[in-house]
Amino acid sequence: MAATLISAVACGGAPPFSGIECGTADERLESSYDASGRECVWNAYERGNAARWTLRSYTIEGDPIPTTLLIQPAGGIGLVVTRDTSADKFGGVGNQRVFTYRCSTMTKMPRRDDISRYSFILTNCTGDGPSTSVP
């Protein structure tokens, strides 16, 4: 463990993000909706630009689920979703961890109750599953 930490520090860690910052959203169940963050992400995706959006959603019990959606077209990285469910007290065995999906396709999915609002569906993924959604 110490060798890993020393190695990460010596190498400078992950390179800084270079792209469009689409902001940080805090969305409680159905009570808030970050339209500008979603539009920023969608516009970057359509134009092939790098972008990052950070979202904190919550379980029905109120446990936070931080999620990051990264669009990184350069170098073939594509779309990366990281979702941390480790604070989900009712998540069940094996589901309280960080999930990572590396995907090649993203589409908008209108909400049933309000078609002006949408989430993202990501498909053709590797990592923790073949698809995922971002609220």
Language-model region placement:
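Bacterial lipoprotein signal-peptidase II cleavage site
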Residues: 12-19
